[in-house]
A protein has these predicted regions:
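Alpha-helical transmembrane segments and their immediate juxtamembrane cytosolic regions
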Residues: 1-357
Length: 357
């Protein structure tokens, strides 16, 4: 029997994935979004955590749903590297270095593809177009470690509650992750994983403590309060989990919790609106293709912009976007959501057709 999905959690995922694409699109409020949007996904995963079926079953599931997409997507981008060079999606033109944050790409050989795929298998590096998958790597590492620690604690404590020892362990890892960030150490993404373990833990705590039945006016008040807190905190510090950067451990925890409240109340407040609820839930069930494909999808907007303005072809390789200001972020966001959804729909249709035969 299929597991019943929580529509509020799906909507929260949907809001989170929209925020992620917005944060990469040149949206003016990107710094605000970065305060909490990636922490949200770790907390959602913690909320859904269950060792039902045992640790081996859990690990196998994470290998299929996280590790395999990471390896396959990065390998696909590597295989397509030379084609992307011909199409200017990537470029070897050194003029691209004049665009901040960009790098020159060189052609790859079959040997390169094999060698890099081995690296992807152990989360050593990644591709430019697959840059957002740092999160998939970190979530895999955190999920597996949390499950193993939980299993060991259950054995040691003979079935007693593991919440307190897990909390103490997550606190130690948070401190270590913060120190790693200050030192610039992040081998295999382990610094990020150490920092984010506590966010996964927070999700498990919230699952136990969250009240479901709250009057609408109280939800509105909580939403407004969380928004105000984040606005204030945004003036006091910053969060950049992709680089394991945050002002302090306490700052990370407070912004993450405020972001959770903001997004959860938004999901609950929009639940009575069928169109919004269905759209957010649909997005929430398609987070992986959006994470993998939204940077590539941005290229369509840049290409159309260059056709209109007569820009140099090599500028198509500008990453993640080239055009900024005005309403360009709207176009990039639309492409970053719609095109991956379309690709996912085609993939599912082909998959179902093949399975049917």
């Amino acid at each position: 029997m299929a597991k019943q999905r929580d529509p509020v959690i799906d909507s929260m995922r949907g809001i989170g994935i929209v925020l992620m694409v917005l944060g990469h699109s040149g949206f003016p409020g990107t710094d605000f979004i970065y305060l909490f949007h990636m922490a949200l996904f770790f907390m959602l995963s913690g909320w859904l955590f269950s060792l039902r079926g045992g640790p081996l079953h859990f690990i196998k599931r994470k290998v299929v749903t996280l590790w395999l997409p990471f390896v396959l997507a990065n390998t696909a981008f590597t295989v397509l590297n030379n084609l992307f060079l011909k199409l200017n999606i990537l470029t070897s033109d050194e003029r691209i270095l004049q665009v901040p944050g960009n790098a020159v790409t060189t052609p790859v050989t079959v040997k390169d593809v094999i060698g890099r795929t081995v690296h992807w298998c152990v989360f050593d590096g990644g591709t430019q177009l697959g840059g957002a998958m740092w999160f998939i790597q970190a979530l895999f590492q955190v999920s597996i470690l949390y499950a193993l620690v939980e299993f060991i604690l259950q054995r040691l404590l003979h079935g007693a509650d593991t919440l307190l020892p897990q909390g103490l362990f997550s606190g130690v890892l948070l401190w270590l992750g913060w120190r790693c960030g200050l030192a610039g150490w992040n081998v295999w993404g382990l610094g990020i994983a150490a920092s984010c373990y506590c966010l996964f833990y927070l999700g498990t705590v919230l699952r136990r403590t969250t009240r479901e039945s709250i009057p609408t006016y109280q939800r509105g008040t909580l939403f407004a309060a969380a928004f105000a807190v984040l606005l204030i905190l945004g003036r006091l510090g910053s969060v950049g989990l992709a680089g394991n950067g945050y002002s302090s451990p306490i700052f990370l925890l407070v912004t993450s919790l405020a972001g959770w409240v903001l997004v959860r109340e938004a999901a609950c407040l929009t639940a009575p609106l069928p169109c919004v609820r269905v759209a957010l839930a649909y997005l929430g069930r398609a987070t992986m293709p959006i994470v993998i494909l939204h940077f590539l999808s941005f290229k369509l907007v840049t290409w159309l912009g260059l056709l209109t303005t007569g820009g140099e072809p090599y500028l198509l390789a500008a990453f993640p976007i080239y055009f900024t200001g005005g309403a360009w972020w709207l176009a990039y966001t639309a492409a970053g959501l719609v095109l991956p959804l379309a690709a996912n729909a085609v993939y599912k249709k082909i998959k179902n057709t093949v399975l049917a035969h």
